[in-house]
Amino acid sequence: MSIGPSMPLRLEKPEGIDLAQAARYFGARGGADAATQALLEKCAVPLLAAATPRAVWLEADHDSLTAAGILAGEDVAKHLEGCTAALLLAVTLGPGVDAQIRRAGVGDIAAGVASDALGSALAEQAAEAAEAELRQWAARQGKYLTGRYSPGYGDWPLAVQPLLAAALDTARRAGLCVTENNLMTPRKSITAILGVSDHPVRGHLAGCGHCVLRTRCEYRKRGITCASE
């Protein structure tokens, strides 16, 4: 088995954005108050209208992914323990969402921050929908998948983003590019790997000690972890 070519996943735009998740991204601890809820509801309408979710994926074996430099670090290897292959996934909301976030923030910082939080929540919804499609595919093959594991988790470096994008041909197939600083554009995009196994497998949950966000993580400031929500 080699890498590629990637294949598209059909994603339906959800009827609404998960406002509870958006409130958490917004920094509303313990849930949104009335003013925050109203702001999120107001900003959600144009944000959702601007979204054009797209996703691509492929299946590859460990040797091919290792040769391509994608399986860098120890934690992603632990995540794939017991797996015979892996799926690469990329999901993006499209450039319209980035543009809407910028528009919302002109003269209204709070609306810009709220729109950014809504974009993050919607990107996660799109990734969850894509993962659900892949789980259905795996079930038809009699296979099982781990959870999603993204660059920046544990010691899996953001430096693999260009490699994932190249393997998935995201620029051509989804309009998703990676900058010289390993940042994705459009910004509201997610890449991930999922292990494929012949038996149920959970994958590896990285500890906070290796996470690239450990010094500025809002969850850690509250004495909890992202795995608890």
Residue map of PLM features:
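Generic secondary-structure signature for well-ordered alpha-helical cores
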Residues: V45-T52, R135, A139, D169, ...
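Conserved active-site and cofactor/substrate-binding residues in soluble primary-metabolism enzymes
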Residues: A35-A38, K42, A121, Q125, ...
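Metal/cofactor-centered catalytic core regions of large enzymes
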Residues: A34, E74-K78, H210, T215-R216, ...
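Active-site helix-to-loop segments that bind/position phosphate- or nucleotide-bearing substrates
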Residues: M1-G112
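Short terminal or interdomain "cap/linker" segment that borders an active site or interface and mediates
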Residues: Q141-Y219
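Conserved mixed alpha/beta catalytic, RNA-binding, or beta-rich assembly cores of soluble enzyme
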Residues: C83-G147
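Short cysteine/histidine-rich metal-coordination sites, predominantly Zn2+-binding motifs
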Residues: I224-E229
